[in-house]
Structure formats: structure tokens, C-alpha cells
Amino acid sequence: METIGRGTWIDKLAHELVEREEALGRDTEMINVESGLGASGIPHMGSLGDAVRAYGVGLAVGDMGHSFRLIAYFDDLDGLRKVPEGMPSSLEEHIARPVSAIPDPYGCHDSYGMHMSGLLLEGLDALGIEYDFRRARDTYRDGLLAEQIHRILSNSSVIGEKIAEMVGQEKFRSSLPYFAVCEQCGKMYTAESVEYLADSRKVRYRCGDAEVGGRKIAGCGHEGEADTGGAGGKLAWKVEFAARWQAFDVRFEAYGKDIMDSVRINDWVSDEILSSPHPHHTRYEMFLDKGGKKISKSSGNVVTPQKWLRYGTPQSILLLMYKRITGARELGLEDVPSLMDEYGDLQREYFAGGGRGGKAREAKNRGLFEYTNLLEAQEGPRPHAGYRLLVELSRLFRENRTERVTKKLVEYGVIDGPSPGIERLIALAGNYADDMYSAERTEVELDGATRGALSELAEMLGSAPEGGLQDVIYGVAKSHGVPPRDFFKALYRIILDASSGPRIGPFIEDIGREKVAGMIRGRL
């Protein structure tokens, strides 16, 4: 089978995108990819992933010889439906108001919406993602969607019927797919848009009670007109994507399964109402918390880029996003160690050559490593040490941690000497050891012989001679008929939750014999 591009799903999508654009007869010199991002709640890894994956497809398009641009569009005209957990209760008075019109409770941005947007932009910057930042407030205020809004609202009756037909939503049969902002009370979801005045391009609305975020919000009773050429309101999501796609010449946008119906309708609006071919898409599954629930911007189960980057490198996040796009995945900060070590394995395989799984697998892993480094050429491997080993050593050495952990890594033969890269890894693993360490480990499968050997070793750890522990461990394994390699692997799994590590005898001495004996007994 022929390898497409660098052998990843990213390359496959990019090739499909370019082939489609060429078949449509559109100019492919510059290809815009878009990520539509919410600004009403705390941005999480799922929000980040939408933009990171779109950027990856853009990189692959660039790899094919085209120019690309990632448009990061933040919907800060969206209304606040509920106050996210952990945010000030003073935000309650702003429910149903556009997040761009709500003061930043922390006073560091021009609005609540920009505060939330800023957190996500901070994450993108940390990863090295380049983007063209656009705000809904400015987009509407500057009239960039004015023509699209006019055509959509002029065809609101047929659109309302189509929405009802496609997804069974009756709402837009009786009201326009446009949320006006009441000029009297400043709320938007309470202001029902009832008529489009095409000649003046204004929307008539009346502000009444509405259900917002699962509760009733009172309207003020005002009736007025909103100018669709400014920021006096916004299109509903059921039609807004299509307006953006045409106005910004968007050729690719991925989407989560939670907005699948909105994308289907927008595709139809784009094709049939705006006479503009909709972008190429791919659907991704959502990140779930460890309880299997969807990660939500308004709930407390949010893994943010900032939290992750306290413990892991940017490459660990990029690996998470680029290794695959299909299938729902449970995600928590406890996944940082495995992704850090997986990146180390990818790097080692990339520079050493070879690898398991045949040529196609090797090509895919090489491509994955390259995308994880944003296609920036790597002259050689970055300094690396097993993350779980670093965490264990960091738990042992809290005073003068960097110096003492580095010394042990040199003694174990893991590194040749100190370096800024290793110091950074020690700092990250130290944060994890201080904040996150849990005695909970993955299940270790042990056969009867290995259990017997481990039980004997736990008893002997207190009496084995100084400096002779490596030979004692080897002898115990042999006496129980357990291959030493397998016995060492079981010990690494118990101590490090990994399949390999430094020379086991000196490592146990460093951790403490009594402590390791307790760890072994806890698994028997």
C-alpha cells in the first residue's frame, strides 16, 4: 500500500482536502482551515484539540506545497448560559448576556469572553501553534458577515422548514435564526427575533421570558430593532458556520460529534442558500473525564492546557492530539506520564531507526514524531529520561532536587551529564510528584512462580549484604525458575509502573529497601 505523505491520518485528510478543492476548481494557492472556539467557559484540552488538529491538517497542506492559514475564531458574542464551577458568583447577574459584554471578573482583559479566549490562546502559543485570531464581536461589528446574514435571513422560512426536516427542531419555523441583543436589558436569548426588515437590514425582536441553561430567565418586555450590520446580535449556530465559511473562504473545519447536527444544516445552508461549497470535514470524538463523562467548559471536570503543561511538555500534548482522531478517550492528568514516555519512545525510534510493526508502521511513527514537532527539523534527540523514573526520584529528593536527581541519572547511565533539557524534565516530573502522586497503580499480572520469588525477595531485602542486592535479586529469580529479565520487569512494574528502568539493585537502594519491600507486599 502506498504511503500518503508522512503516513498519518493528518496526511490522508490533507490529500482528500486538496483533491476536493481541485475537483471544485477552486484556487489552492492559499487554503484556510478554521477552528471555531467557544468563549463562554473555561477552555479545556478538547477546545485546544480542535485548533491543534486543524493546524496539523494545515501543516500537511503546506507540506504538499500550498500555503495555509489557521483561523482561530472565538465566539465571544455567545451568551453566558451558566456560571462555570470555580468562577465568581457575581457572574450570575450576567446570565444571557454576550460574554464580550460581561466585565472580566479578574480585571486583566476587556471582557469575560476575552479572558476565556486568552487562556486558550496562551495554550496555543505554548505549543507553537500559529493562528489568525478573530473575535465574533469584531467580525459582526465590522460587518464582515453582513451579506451572508442578509441572504440567510431573507430565506429564513425555507431554512426553518429545512431545520425541522433535518433534525426535528421546530423553533426556527416561528422565529428567525438570529439572536438579537436587547438594547434595554442587554440580554440576547430572551430577545426573540420575529421579523426581518430586508430593506433596512434590521431584525424586529421582543424581549420576553426564556429558558437559558436549564432555568427560566426573565425578559424585560422591550420591543425593538437590531441592526444586522453591526454587533447588535448574531446568527444562531445552525446557520452561522456557513456564513463564516463563505466570508473567510474556509476550506476545512473538523467538528465534534456534539455539534454534528449543526454542521449538517450549515453544510446545506452553505451549498443551497449561499451557493458556496461547504468545507471539507472530519468528525472527532470527544475527550471524556475518567468517569466517562464529556468534559465541559462549565463543569469542574476540566483538564486545561495550563494544568497539563505544569507536568508535561508541549510535545506530550501534540502527541495526544495527533496520534489519532477517532474514538472517544478518557483523559486526566494521570495520563501525562504515559504520553511523556511514549514521546520518548517515538524519539528514540526516530533517531535509532527500525521499530516494530513493519514499514507502514515505521513510516507512520516517523510521521507522527514529525507532526508532534510541527514539522520542524530536529538535528538530534532532545535529552530524555523515563518520566516515571523522574517522578520516583523526585519523590525521594525534595531538597536540591535537580542536582541530586541528575546525579542519580548519571550513576544509572541514563544520561551523560546535566543539561537544560533534563533540568526542565526534572522540574515537570517534580511538579507531578508534589501535586499528583497517588499510590494507585495499574494492575500487575503475576504468575505463581513470580509471586513466590517476590515474596522471598521482600523478606530478604532487610538482610541482604550492602552492595550485593543485584546478585541477591538475580539469585532469587533463578531459584524460583523465573527468568531474571521477567523478574526485573515485574519489579519495575511494581516500583515505577513501567516495564524497564535503571539497574534494579542500586535503584532499590536509593528508594529504600524497607519501602520497596512494602510496595512488593502490597501487590501480593
Curated annotation (Swiss-Prot):
Binding residues for ATP: K297
UniProt-recorded Gene Ontology molecular function terms: ATP binding; lysine-tRNA ligase activity; tRNA binding
Principal subcellular localization: cytoplasm
Catalysis: reaction(s): tRNA(Lys) + L-lysine + ATP = L-lysyl-tRNA(Lys) + AMP + diphosphate
EC number: 6.1.1.6
Motif 'HIGH' region, residue range(s) on this chain: 39-47
Protein's UniProt keywords contain Ligase: yes
InterPro entries membership: aa-tRNA-synth_I_codon-bd_sub2, aa_tRNA-synth_I_cd-bd_sf, Lys-tRNA-ligase, Rossmann-like_a/b/a_fold
Localization annotation: Cytoplasm
GO biological process, one term: lysyl-tRNA aminoacylation
Residue ranges of the motif 'KMSKS' region: 294-298
UniProt keyword annotations, A-Z: Aminoacyl-tRNA synthetase, ATP-binding, Cytoplasm, Ligase, Nucleotide-binding, Protein biosynthesis
One Gene Ontology term, aspect cellular component: cytoplasm
Family, per entry: Belongs to the class-I aminoacyl-tRNA synthetase family.
PANTHER family for the chain: LYSINE--TRNA LIGASE
Protein name: Lysine--tRNA ligase
